[in-house]
Amino acid sequence: MRRPPGNGEAASEGPGGWGLWGVQESRRLCCAGHDRCKQALLQIGINMMALPGGRHLDSVTLPGQRLHLMQVDSVQRWMEDLKLMTECECMCVLQAKPISLEEDAQGDLILAGGPGPGDPLQLLLKRGWVISTELRRIGQKLAQDRWARVHSMSVRLTCHARSMVSEYSAVSRNSLKEMGEIEKLLMEKCSELSAVTERCLQVENEHVLKSMKACVSETLSMLGQHFGQLLELALTREVQALVRKIDASDNIYTTESTTGNLFSLTQEGAPLCRIIAKEGGVVALFKVCRQDSFRCLYPQALRTLASICCVEEGVHQLEKVDGVLCLADILTDNSHSEATRAEAAAVVAQVTSPHLPVTQHLSSFLESMEEIVTALVKLCQEASSGEVFLLASAALANITFFDTMACEMLLQLNAIRVLLEACSDKQRVDTPYTRDQIVTILANMSVLEQCASDIIQENGVQLIMGMLSEKPRSGTPAEVAACERVQQKAAVTLARLSRDPDVAREAVRLSCMSRLIELCRSPSERNSSDAVLVACLAALRRLAGVCPEGLQDSDFQQLVQPRLVDSFLLCSNMEESFV
């Protein structure tokens, strides 16, 4: 099941550490002094295993996404790896360099399946990932002063770098002069690293080793920078070739294949998405979406656009080519398939994500907002599957953050009735991710006074009460986080709606106060979430102001009467046995 684009949660970011091929968050090598050197190495790298979300869609960061998963039999994977493993070790032997026999030696080289012949793009991604892994591990061993391991891994790094350069040169077109210069610098630094680490093996004086360690760190940093520059140039060149192919093609099969390759690249992380946007990928894909002869390719092109627009550069390019107008045309045209309109909704959800500050300046979106919102509500109402409903509701949820007028539009379109009716349809609403979108819309609409009467009329208070009991089915971190968001937003919605005495009395009648007290006092009920606790305390205090008779004295004295921060501290420190 795909998960939707983010709608304003302070949700966790994607996998930390090494970016797919790009800049890593600043980590530090534990080498005394030379802070600049410590950080420079870890600014470049590839980690194919990070598997950033396909669309970078999350529920409020929306988890999102079609994950780029490779399900390959382990024996088959080992057979594919064997060629590169033996190649590397043979090169080490030819250079008369010993391979370490330390107990952790086998874990120092991690390889994915080998690229096919004549596939420069996959070759770059694979070799780049291997080299970045080696760089990271050399840094770790250097911090531990394990010089034998540092040296053997440096030799292996040189082998991989030489292989990447020679293999790419063999399958690529004429190399750029700039690439040749960087290749030369990279190999020089690799040789320098091997030589200096070999000398370190002969040194026993700690003071001398300390000074040499700084030199190794500096060399490693420069090597990482050259590697990153070379990889970016090579990937940019390959992306340019794909974009030109899409732009010039009038053959549906060629366009389908090339667009699929471009989509696969977007799954490798934000840095590659930036390159694709910069090199005209957004322009080329919207060109596809404006040609009737390519209508069957619209879903694939839109899916790729949604992934590219996870970065600001993609959104900028989308606005430059009037992409919002194109999306509005697709969403409002009933002749398009449901799948096409759902993918267009996914792009809307992505470009309106509150996590991208640039989306707040999409002036073109305001011009088409009414027809887009109307089309999305209709798509929610007619959705034939949970995935279609999820994408459409995620787009609506993000739009309610984007502009306050959207909430008034939704009220006029009877969106509350559409959403609440969908909650009883398991075919459309069957995951906490989808309920997260629904309760987000309700929470943002609840600031309008007219919303309360519609909620009561559609038995919405009972639905909100049910959301306070949202539980994960699988126990995965993403689903647990989604359930926490549902509980938190349900409490926020209840607190806002309880300004209306009728809503407050209905909530008390449905025992909402008892459930709120349970969430406050029992950490396991809220997965020990502080955000859920604060929201529940706020809702409980609002209800107590209208119907104080629904509280016992102990609950009033501990959860309502003190300052909010005092009640929070009391509940957050409670042991489970207290209940």
Swiss-Prot record:
Motif (PDZ-binding): 576-579
Superkingdom classification of source: Eukaryota
Gene Ontology CC annotation, any one: protein-containing complex
Sorted UniProt keywords: Cytoplasm, Developmental protein, Differentiation, Neurogenesis
GO molecular function term, any single one: cytoskeletal anchor activity
Residues covered by region (Important for interaction with GPSM2): 74-89
GO BP terms: apical protein localization; asymmetric cell division; cell differentiation; nervous system development; regulation of asymmetric cell division; regulation of protein stability
Keyword Lipid metabolism: no
Assembly with partners or alone: Interacts with ALS2CR19/PAR3B and F2RL2/PAR3. Interacts with GPSM1/AGS3 and GPSM2/LGN (via TPR repeat region). Identified in a complex with GPSM2 and F2RL2.
UniProt protein name: Protein inscuteable homolog
Location of this chain's protein in the cell: Cytoplasm; Cytoplasm, Cell cortex
Main location: cytoplasm
Resulting phenotype, K97D: Abolishes interaction with GPSM2 and GPSM1
Organism: Homo sapiens
Transmembrane parts of this sequence: none
Function: May function as an adapter linking the Par3 complex to the GPSM1/GPSM2 complex. Involved in spindle orientation during mitosis. May regulate cell proliferation and differentiation in the developing nervous system. May play a role in the asymmetric division of fibroblasts and participate in the process of stratification of the squamous epithelium.
